[in-house]
Amino acid sequence: MEKAMQKEQRKLPEDTWCNPLVLENYPIGFLAPGRVGKNSGSMANFNGPARDFRELGDPEVLYDDGRWYLFPSVGEAYVSTDLVNWKYEKIKFANGEKLGYAPTIVKCRGKYLLSSSWPFAGKTEILQAFEPLGPYHSLGEPVDGEGKCLAPEWIDPMLFCDDDGRLYAYWHFGGTGEGIFGIELNPDNPIQGIGKPVKLLDFNPENQFECFGDFNEHSDMAWIEGESMFKHNGEYYLQYSACGTQFRAYTVGVGRSKSPLGPFVIQKTPVAREKYGRVCGTGHGSWVKGPDGSVWQFYTSLTRRIHMFERRIGMDRVKFDVNGDAHVQITAVPQSVGGGGLGILPVSVFKKSLASSAAGCCYSGFAFDDCTHTWWMPDDIDEHPWIEVDLLQDFDIYAFQVIWAEEGVDITQGILPEPAKYKLEFFSGNDEKKLVAVWNFYDNDRDLLIDFRSMDMVRARYVRLSYLPSVNPGLKRGVNNLTVFGKR
C-alpha cells in the first residue's frame, strides 16, 4: 500500500529512506591497491588507473531483540532500530579473527554463528559468540560427516537455523558446472557435518537470467553465487544470484522446496532485477523478517565507477503472490518503511546544469544523469566548488540525495575519506532568481559517501550544491549523482 502525501504536507514521514542506503564510514574495498598492492592480478578490473575505492555489498541481516544487524562485505556491521538510521559498529573478535567477503550471521540455540568466504578471511572457519557483535572466537573449519573438509571451496557461505533448531550450511564454488551445495551441521558442534554435502543448484541456461553477461548473452556460461536461505509458510526459499556482480543485469533468483536440502524448483522469473539507474545490478543479498511479519530483501547495488566490484547496498519489500512466488520491486525514490511509496519523484534527472568548473571531461551534466559510473569533478584549482541544476519549473521539493565521487584516496599515504561540508541553496523565478531557502550542512561530522536528507518542503526551480574543499588536499571530491525529489 502506498502512503500518498497530501498536498498540504510539508515534510516526509520520519521513517523515510531512499536507496542506496545511507551507511557511514564506507570501507576501502578488499581489492583496492592500498590493501593488496598494485601488482595484484585484480588491477585489470579497474576503470582507468588502479586506485583505492570504497565498497559495501553482499548484505546479510539479522533481526534480533528489536534491532537489525547488517553484516556486509568489507565492512564491520551496521545496527538499526528502525531500518532508516544505521549506526556503524565494530565487530569484536577474541583472537584476531577476521571476516572476508559475504559474511553470514545466524542465531541458533541462543548462540550467534558467523562465517564468511575464505578469500580475505584467510581461512575457512565458523565463529561463535553470545552477542551479535561478539566477541567471536573460532570453532575451527567445518567438515562433513566423515571428517573431510567441505569441498568445493567455502565461498558465500550461508548458515541457517530451522524452526526445530537444526542447523544447515550452504556455499558455492565458481562458475559453470560447480553450483551451490548444502549440508546439515550439528548445532551443538557447528563445525561437524552430518552426512555428505549435497549439490542443490547449478546453472540452467533455460533460465536466461542466469546466463553470464549484461545482456545474458553467454548462453553456455554462468556464475551462480550469493546463496541465502529463508523459510516462508513452511517452504524453503534458497536465494541465489546470477550473471556476474559486475553487470547491470546481476539479479536474484530463488529455488523453492519442502526440505532445506531440496530438491529445489527454480522460480522462472527473477525475484529482484533492475538494469538501469542509480540502483541497478541488484543481486547478492538476503531476506529478513521484521516484527510485523514483513519480509525485506537486502541486496547489492552496482556502482563500478572505479572498480568492477565497487558496490552499494539497498533494501526493498518482498511480496509473495498467491502461488508463493516472491517478487521485489526495486526502488530509487523515497519510501516509507510503514507505508511504501510517497508519490515523490526525481525532478532533476537530465535537467540543465551549471558548475563552477570541470576537471577534464567530468562535466556538470554527469551529476544529473542517474548513472552510477559517471561523475562531475571540479577543477583542481577551484577553491569554491558548486554545481547547479535548473528544474525548468517550480517544484515542491522534499528531499535530496547526494552520492559523492572521490578521487585520490590512498590509505598507504594517509589520504583518507572525510565528512563532506556542504549546503544546498534553493531559488525560484524565471528571469531573475530569488533565494528562497538554504539547507546548511557545513557542520556535518559524519563520513557519508551517500547522503539522503528530507527537510521542510521548499518550492523552487533552481538547486545549487556548494561544498568546502577537502581538508587533505590530496582528496578530490566531486558528485556522482545529485538527485532532487519533489512533485508539482
Residue positions per predicted region:
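Beta-rich carbohydrate-recognition and catalytic domains
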Residues: 2-156, 161-219, 231-278, 292-294, ...
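Short, surface-exposed loop/turn motifs at beta-strand boundaries within globular domains
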Residues: 54, 63, 73, 222, ...
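Extracellular beta-strand-rich recognition modules
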Residues: 171, 299, 463-467
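Predominantly extracellular/luminal regions of secreted and cell-surface proteins
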Residues: 181-192, 337-369
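Beta-propeller domains
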Residues: 224-226, 232
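Short, surface-exposed coil-to-beta transition loops
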Residues: 281-283, 419
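Aromatic, loop-rich ligand-recognition surfaces of beta-strand-rich domains
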Residues: 369-435, 449-488
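Solvent-exposed serine/threonine-rich low-complexity stretches and specific carbohydrate-binding patches
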Residues: 435-443
